[in-house]
Structures are given as C-alpha cells and as structure tokens.
Amino acid sequence: MHKLYIETVGCQMNMLDSEMVVADLRRQGYELAQDVDSADTILLNTCSVREQAENKTYSSLGRLRKVKKENPEKIIGVMGCMAQKDQQLIFRRAPYVDLVVGPGQLQQIPGLIEKARVEGGQHTAVSLGRTAGKLQDIKRSHETFDPMRDPTMRPNPFQAFLRIQIGCDKFCTYCIVPMTRGPEQGRHPQEIYDEAVILADQGAKEITLLGQTVNSYLHIDKDKQETRLADLLTRLHDINGLERIKFVTSYPKDMTLDLLQTIRDLKKVSPYLHVPLQSGSDAVLKRMKRGYTVGEYRDMMARINETLGDAAAVSSDFIVGFCGETDAEFQETVDLVKECRFKNSFIFKYSERPGTKAAGKLPDDVPFEVKRQRNNELLAVQNKISEEDNQSFLGRTVDVLIEGPSKRHDAAVNKVVNEEAQTKSLEDLDRVVVGDPASAAKESTLVQLSPATGKPIDEYKNHVADKQKAMLEQYERSGEMVQLTGRTHCDRIVVFDGSPRLIGRTEPIGIYDISGLTLMGTVVTDQAVGLVNLQKSS
C-alpha cells in the first residue's frame, strides 16, 4: 500500500487541485500519510503569484534533500504553477526531484509516479506555452481532468470549492497566472451542474465557484448558445441540499447589472463580492494594465449598492509599492478605500515576478521599507473601517453556517476549519493542507456509487457522521464548552460557545460584541440553546 503526503501552497484553485489529485491516487490504492517520514510519495502543490510562496516551496524542497538521500526510493514531485513556469529550474535547484507536473497535466501524476518508481529518472508534464501553437491546442493542453472529489481533504464536509473557469486572458503586468494557467476557458455548464449535485450528495451545504475572473465566465456551445455566470447561478440555485452559493474572484468590468440582479433575486447566492481594485490611482492601474479606471470602479460600486443595498459585502485586493508608485498615487488608494468602505481587504507589497510583463520592463523602484510602511498604513485604514462596519451588527441576529471549533480548539480538530483560507483571494492566498491518514477511504465496488468518491453516497454520509461522532465524544469526555466558528451569508466570521452537535448546521446567532474583525455571538434558538445546556450538564 503506497502512502502519499501532499503539501499545498497557494489559492483555492490549488486546494481544489490537491483534492482531485488525492482522489485520483486513492483510486490507485494510495492512503494519506501525516508526514514525509511515513510516506513513500511526496507531492508539493505550488504557487508562483508571489515570491514568498515560491520561497516556501524551495524551503520545503531543501528539507526533503536529506529525506531523499536517506530514502532514495521515495518519490518527490512538484506540481502546480511553479512546475509549469520553472520546470527546468526546479530540477537544477533540486536534482533529487522525480517529477514536475503543471496544473493542466495533473491527470498524468499517477502514471508518472509509477514510471519514476519503476524506471527512475526525472519526468515532466507541462502544458503548452501561450505562444507554443494554435489557440485550441494550447487550451486543450491546459484542460483539467474530470472531477473526482475527495471530501475528506476539505477543511469540513459542509463547504466545497467548484471550479467553473480555468486560465485568464487579462494579462495584468504584475501577474504570472495567464502563463501558468493558460487561456481563459469556461467549463461546460452541464459538467458544473453535475459536479454541484455530487457535492450536495456528499453533504456540502455551501459551494464556492472558482475562477481567476469568475464573473467573466462564458461558455459557448456548438449551437452558439451562450451561458454566463448569471445563467449558471440560476441553474445551480435549484439543487436540493445546497443552502449557499458563493463565487470568487471577480473582475470589476464584468460586474454587470444583470449579474447583480440575479444575485439579488436568488436567496441562495451570497451577496459577498470579492472584487480586487489593486490601486486607487488611474496612473498605477494603467501601468498594471488592469483594464478599468477608478471612475469605472466607482460606477460598479454604485451598481452594487443600488441593486443589493445593505445586503452587499464587498472586499478587495491591493498591491502597494507597484512600479513607480508615488506618495500621491498611494494616497489616492487610501482615499478610495475610505470612500468605498470595503468589508475587508487583502493588502500585499509588490514583488517582481519573472515571466510577467512588468519584469524587466517596469522598474521595481519603490524601496522595500516604503512598501512596508504603505502596507501597514493601508491595512490600518482598512481594519478601522472593518471594525466600524462590524459595529452595525451589534444587537442583530444573523444566520451562521457553523464550520467547526474555532482556532482556540484547533489543536484537537485542526482540519475542521481554517478561517483565513476561505476568505483570501485566488491571487494571494498562502495555505498549507496536509492529509490525514485517519480519513483515508477505500474504494467501494457497490453499484450505487457517487461519481466523485467512488463510494456509495449513503456510505459517505455515514463516514461524515462517524467523524462527527468521534469529535463529539472527545469534547463530551472533557466536559468543556466549545468555542465554535462559522460564517454569515455575506462571509462575516462569527464565533460563539456551543455544542459540537451544531457543527454543519445553519443557526441564528445573536451578536453581542466584536473582537477585531470577528463578530462575537450567542445561540438564540430554543433547540440550539437546549444543545448548549445539554453540553453544560453532561
């Protein structure tokens, strides 16, 4: 029995890729290992968006040098965006790596692992570059393999990512994604619908639709029939079992009135919109080649507020210290953040990425210390706005999908919830996911199988129930109350004391305090209060 250890750095796309690779390898008889020592196959899923993410991967590879020397039979593979961009560099810097596989070739991983194990040597599978052939050939080389979902790899069984789009054609000057993920393509709507049904059958109550510019989603069938995001949301809305539908990350120019009206009219669709602005200066936006002006972004915000009203929650991304950014241009960003009053923002210092249009053409001339100061200043402005915004929730009752124990209880069940991972943008998330051998599931040969897991749907639901039962017994033995965490429909984090029996349910929570960017609450329904009282008396 082969054992796999997988480490993931990067965005939700990478987390989803890892989930699918694990599912594929489990079908080959693999189990998950908790650490590299107990694994015979080690995969690093990588990100190239920021230098910090690449440094994490090379740091991990450095630690694996000794492991490989002492255990040459172990297979080490690098997958994801770094693999697509730097395959030969990876082999030069870490010659003990056995395989390098780009994000569009993940279906080849099982075969390449076996080939490396039998034949030895180094093996590569990457997609065509953006200028390496005809457009259709390039697109086909970046297509992801059929979804095989592995719910035990998710932070919890109740929330799942669903890819609806791959690639990007925006070519922002700072961004490497169009090179590593390939041309923008919308998946067939029927494939998306079928996968959403699978996720609902597995117990997912909330799905998050993923795309580099997800609201640009477009699929044109052979009859020239167009399907856009608004059409897709309408269709997914009718799936039984799903309670919430979110989507990230959005592009400002494609936040159309039609899409906003669809969000308004479909109660399952979250009014949380992550729409990166990146800069409040037209001059900087032009250098970034973002494709819109500050005025157009303001118009978009006006459409959102007019259509969704107070229900809307908009978050954003910002890059400070981009090439040539002056004090005045940075101040324009500060002023616009104060004007737009985002729910939250993710703020990052610019770092030049080799292979992007900015590298070598635009000087990275803002000193690091200036970048750091601007990062801290803008973060302080945004945090003040977020805290003021959260004050408006005091005394209100909000519906919360309860994800699991908060970080205070994370040591015991540290794979149930990760607050940060579910809010950061596709471009900027750093996250490590490590498999848990206790959750490995054998493939079933029964007839009524879920296409996602290869297991009977009822059997999987029993697996989830068993996992919850074990967690409940652990807390009940300790006699402790548990601080739980969850999210509102508009993606605000809420923590409160309650019974673990509430995990996976959507409950009304009364908000009585705030702590930083977190809402503090208490259960308010008779049933939920009863569960809390039962927990206290046990």
Residue locations for each model-derived region?
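Flexible glycine/acidic-rich beta-alpha junction loops that bind and position SAM and/or redox cofactors
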Residues: Q87, G211-K222, M255-T256, L277-M288, ...
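Generic beta-strand/beta-sheet core signal
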Residues: E7, L210-Q212, V248-S250, P276-Q278, ...
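Terminal RNA-binding accessory module
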Residues: A358-S538
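Short flexible coil/turn linkers enriched for glycine and charged/polar residues
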Residues: R154-F158, C168-K170, V269, S279, ...
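Proteins enriched for Cys/Gly/acidic motifs involved in redox and nucleic-acid/cofactor modification
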Residues: M1-L218, R228, D258, I263, ...
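Hydrophobic, well-ordered secondary-structure elements that form the walls
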Residues: V275, D317, V337, S345, ...
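Extended hydrophobic-aromatic, low-complexity segments
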Residues: P271-L273, L285-K286, Y297, E306-A313, ...
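Conserved SAM/AdoMet-binding glycine-rich loop
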Residues: I76-G80, K85, D201-E332, K338, ...
